[in-house]
């Protein structure tokens, strides 16, 4: 269950890049995100509402420059929206709880799903399984 936060207060605490990504559907520069090379065991949450989205076991190195996962934590974690921006069709992924922009999903990922959830670090908050440390993206 998502930790209930005051949305206005939480959005006011976002950095410029976090706000650009989550609220304005922006994209951080490739290979720039804090969580790209994170190898720790834990849960990746939505930065805005702390809804659990992905677990470290589904993370893989796709070489694309953004954290990549082959599946979300559960079906309700993610909302899918057809995106026709930039003269192409993609599938945008948003937080299923607060609607924050996360990134896009592509059908070029590894098994068992064949999907690649390409997620901006700036939209995530990582919680370490060992010590509970939180690392905002």
UniProtKB/Swiss-Prot annotation:
Gene Ontology CC terms: cytoplasm
The family this protein is said to belong to: Belongs to the MsrB Met sulfoxide reductase family.
Catalytic activity: L-methionyl-[protein] + [thioredoxin]-disulfide + H2O = L-methionyl-(R)-S-oxide-[protein] + [thioredoxin]-dithiol
KW Metal-binding (keyword) present: yes
Protein name: Peptide methionine sulfoxide reductase MsrB
E.C. number(s) listed in UniProt: 1.8.4.12
Keywords linked to the UniProt accession: Metal-binding, Oxidoreductase, Zinc
Known cofactor(s): Zn(2+)
Organism: Yersinia enterocolitica serotype O:8 / biotype 1B (strain NCTC 13174 / 8081)
Record PROSITE patterns: MSRB (PS51790)
Active site: 118
GO biological process: protein repair; response to oxidative stress
């Amino acid at each position: 269950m998502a930790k209930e936060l005051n949305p206005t207060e939480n959005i006011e605490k976002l950095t410029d890049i976090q706000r650009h990504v989550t609220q304005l559907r922006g994209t951080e520069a490739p290979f720039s995100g804090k969580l790209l090379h994170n190898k720790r065991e834990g849960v990746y949450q939505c930065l805005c509402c702390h809804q659990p989205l992905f677990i470290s076991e589904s993370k893989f190195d796709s070489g694309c420059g953004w954290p990549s996962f082959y599946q979300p934590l559960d079906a309700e974690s993610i909302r899918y929206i057809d995106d026709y921006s930039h003269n192409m069709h993609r599938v945008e992924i948003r937080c299923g709880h607060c609607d924050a922009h996360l990134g896009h999903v592509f059908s070029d990922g590894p098994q068992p799903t064949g999907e690649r959830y390409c997620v901006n670090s700036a939209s995530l908050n990582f919680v370490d399984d060992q010590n509970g440390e939180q690392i905002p993206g």
